[in-house]
Amino acid sequence: MADTQYILPNDIGVSSLDCREAFRLLSPTERLYAYHLSRAAWYGGLAVLLQTSPEAPYIYALLSRLFRAQDPDQLRQHALAEGLTEEEYQAFLVYAAGVYSNMGNYKSFGDTKFVPNLPKEKLERVILGSEAAQQHPEEVRGLWQTCGELMFSLEPRLRHLGLGKEGITTYFSGNCTMEDAKLAQDFLDSQNLSAYNTRLFKEVDGEGKPYYEVRLASVLGSEPSLDSEVTSKLKSYEFRGSPFQVTRGDYAPILQKVVEQLEKAKAYAANSHQGQMLAQYIESFTQGSIEAHKRGSRFWIQDKGPIVESYIGFIESYRDPFGSRGEFEGFVAVVNKAMSAKFERLVASAEQLLKELPWPPTFEKDKFLTPDFTSLDVLTFAGSGIPAGINIPNYDDLRQTEGFKNVSLGNVLAVAYATQREKLTFLEEDDKDLYILWKGPSFDVQVGLHELLGHGSGKLFVQDEKGAFNFDQETVINPETGEQIQSWYRSGETWDSKFSTIASSYEECRAESVGLYLCLHPQVLEIFGFEGADAEDVIYVNWLNMVRAGLLALEFYTPEAFNWRQAHMQARFVILRVLLEAGEGLVTITPTTGSDGRPDARVRLDRSKIRSVGKPALERFLRRLQVLKSTGDVAGGRALYEGYATVTDAPPECFLTLRDTVLLRKESRKLIVQPNTRLEGSDVQLLEYEASAAGLIRSFSERFPEDGPELEEILTQLATADARFWKGPSEAPSGQA
């Protein structure tokens, strides 16, 4: 069978997202608003298949056809009759659930491919003898012929998402390299175009000269439009000797369905902010305009404390190998008032707490823009994965001048808290009970600080298009050098475009460090209801959780390519390195032998040294992170961050050897089953499913009752239209990296 790195185990944890009580408390109008927003999110989430791998849309279409014709129990009878064992059929269900959960065949957390853990010929027998194949023999056989090989292939380039020889990505055509990505970013910057809703396709003429297409996501294609904001950009350009063409219409039929549902949601908006927000999102997805999405986000920021909260669009850039294109996501959630009250108290203290951060006031925003901070129970989260907390929007210009919102996703955190003692790796026995007791509360504190005062803090020094600066060049001093500011962001440059491949992880590291640093502040712990010995335990478990996570992070490092595949985990490893470097026995990692006779390890944190050794080390590191970010010093930022993120086998830690131990004892990330909403007359019903791979599959089989077959056709048509860009996805066209 396949290497365990590339399969999902049969005993993978599966949890259901509990939002029954939150949904019950909604009024009929709020339910209708949530229903249509959920439909929009689920439709848009299908675009992620096209953003992940060339074969993902076909795999999704094949699975959807199979399970629409026979539910998991019915298909099981057929599979056993075809000679599969119970374990092999369960492996197939887990694979299918994984594809639905990640919206593709690469893990959303780690960007590693996963393949079915059963023989290919056995799966082929099940598929070609299924009810779906009886009903539509040509279509099912065609889908299998298109994706069967790629579904199982683990040749080196296909094991991970990446650019050029490093991996596979559908944000770029298969012949693009990192140099192409940099050139395209410079082109986009020169035209003041955002990369968030784009993909890049490169073609090479007979003389080897490249030609680039930048394609915007939109309902409209080449049709004339009244909107000059985007249409004036839709043309041919010459940039540094290379032809560029800006086009639009990517994912058009999918976005058409998103727009139709957003139009319906408008009728149930609670206020004018929501109505205007939806109108701008509709404009954005119709025209391909990120500027319209920014305007919608402005109204969204102004919509303080809504009962039903949502956000939708091309948002997070973690999975673009270059770090600037957004993956589609949409969520709909309901406010949890009790937990939100704690976060509101944290917001009320935020201005005071910002002063505790280890950089001068001139490196903080000129005015603190009081954000919304709510705890939400998720009803729908469409995309490749569900985070525990979010700080959005990601647009730097809005964050600096208009503000942002923070959300903590309470029912997602509840799934994350559930820890079984026997699965707690790398901890001392006497730490395990304390860890289980305080992991949940400490995580609430860390998520709150990470989102509000981590992502929400710090200023970017900018020179605008008129040459004006947002800082005083004469008086502002760099605390690291003692000199005046030497570098800054010029008009059109953003954090993501400037720091590109390290931007996401560097920013997560800054936010995580702020959480660790500020959780030492007594006022913070009082806000969350902890004092005395309990407060000390919360601090200890928060720091212990971080250093353990730094060790677990090694699973997400690829030694062959010298790269990290997950931004948050790279950030946690960097923090572990900083705390190890602090010395004095603050953190130690000891290789051991487990009770099973196999390699193991133990992480120890000396709680008596957190304040005396850990805090000063974190203070120095955090100040450097912020100064380099504020000043847009890419060279300095890369040197610092990549230095700490380097993984070697040098003693005393021998991280590459430890990585083997981590892989040996890794636990797969849980799959989460989400409910559906269904409209019956004018009533919206909540449909829940069991916490199992079969339950997760059923939830997807019932997600698109009206137009499932149509969506499968749309996905395969869109994938086929661009298939030539990855033909032989395992290798780039000759002459191209």
Swiss-Prot record:
Task: Tell me the active site.
Answer: 451
The organs and tissues expressing this protein are described as: Detected in placenta (at protein level). Detected in erythrocytes (at protein level).
Q: Provide the E.C. number(s) assigned to this enzyme.
A: 3.4.14.4
Q: Which Pfam families match?
A: Peptidase_M49
Residues recorded as binding Zn(2+), renumbered to this chain, are 450, 455, 508
Question: What catalytic reaction does the record list?
Answer: Release of an N-terminal dipeptide from a peptide comprising four or more residues, with broad specificity. Also acts on dipeptidyl 2-naphthylamides
Tell where it localizes: Cytoplasm, Cytosol
Spans traversing the lipid bilayer: none
Entry's cofactor comment: Binds 1 zinc ion per subunit.
From the UniProt record, give one GO term of the biological process aspect.
proteolysis
Q: Which UniProt keywords apply?
A: Acetylation, Aminopeptidase, Cytoplasm, Hydrolase, Metal-binding, Metalloprotease, Protease, Zinc
Q: How does activity depend on pH?
A: Optimum pH is 8.8.
Give the Gene Ontology MF terms in alphabetical order.
Answer: aminopeptidase activity; dipeptidyl-peptidase activity; metalloexopeptidase activity; zinc ion binding
- For the keyword Signal, the answer is no
What are the record's GO terms for cellular component? cytoplasm; cytosol; extracellular exosome
Q: Which residues carry this modification: N-acetylalanine?
A: 2
Name the coenzymes or cofactors required.
Answer: Zn(2+)
Q: How is its activity regulated?
A: Activated by Co(2+). Inhibited by EDTA and o-phenanthroline (in vitro).
Task: Report what the protein is called.
Answer: Dipeptidyl peptidase 3
Species annotation: Homo sapiens
Q: What is the lineage of its organism?
A: Eukaryota, Metazoa, Chordata, Craniata, Vertebrata
In the UniProt record, what gene is named as encoding this protein?
A: DPP3
